[in-house]
Amino acid sequence: MIQQESRLRVADNTGAKEILTIRVLGGSGRRYAGIGDVIVATVKDAIPGGNVKKGDVVKAVIVRTVKERRRPDGSYIRFDENAAVILKNDGDPRGTRIFGPVGRELREKKFMKIISLAPEVL
């Protein structure tokens, strides 16, 4: 459950290490975001020479959350950290590599490029 001011790790090679959520997209009253939801965020920590710099405002999709999520078959999935992948304006990932596992919910939300780049889909 990601909300405004939540900090997330960045799970790609764009150069950002940490982002802070500005807004959860998907309606005016939307408060929380889960795996597969898109957020607007600002880069809080970045490595020098990366594609994004500290202070940049970016769109990102959430790929891992600590809060468990119930699946249709009754099972639950949760991760050890909150993480996101930075997106371009057309919805494709800005980086060329994804680090760590991602949730299967991304497939239902049509983020196929992230699914194909990820080392593991849980």
UniProtKB/Swiss-Prot annotation:
Signal peptide feature range: none
One Gene Ontology term of the molecular function aspect: large ribosomal subunit rRNA binding
CDD domains (alphabetical): Ribosomal_uL14 (cd00337)
Coiled coil stretches, renumbered: none
Pfam family, one: Ribosomal_L14
Chain ranges passing through the membrane: none
Keyword Cell membrane: no
Cellular component terms (Gene Ontology): cytosolic large ribosomal subunit
Any Gene Ontology biological process: translation
Entry keywords, A to Z: Ribonucleoprotein, Ribosomal protein, RNA-binding, rRNA-binding
Family indicated by similarity: Belongs to the universal ribosomal protein uL14 family.
Assembly and binders: Part of the 50S ribosomal subunit. Forms a cluster with proteins L3 and L19. In the 70S ribosome, L14 and L19 interact and together make contacts with the 16S rRNA in bridges B5 and B8.
PANTHER family per record: 50S/60S RIBOSOMAL PROTEIN L14/L23, LARGE RIBOSOMAL SUBUNIT PROTEIN UL14M
Task of the protein: Binds to 23S rRNA. Forms part of two intersubunit bridges in the 70S ribosome.
Descriptive protein name: Large ribosomal subunit protein uL14
Gene: rplN
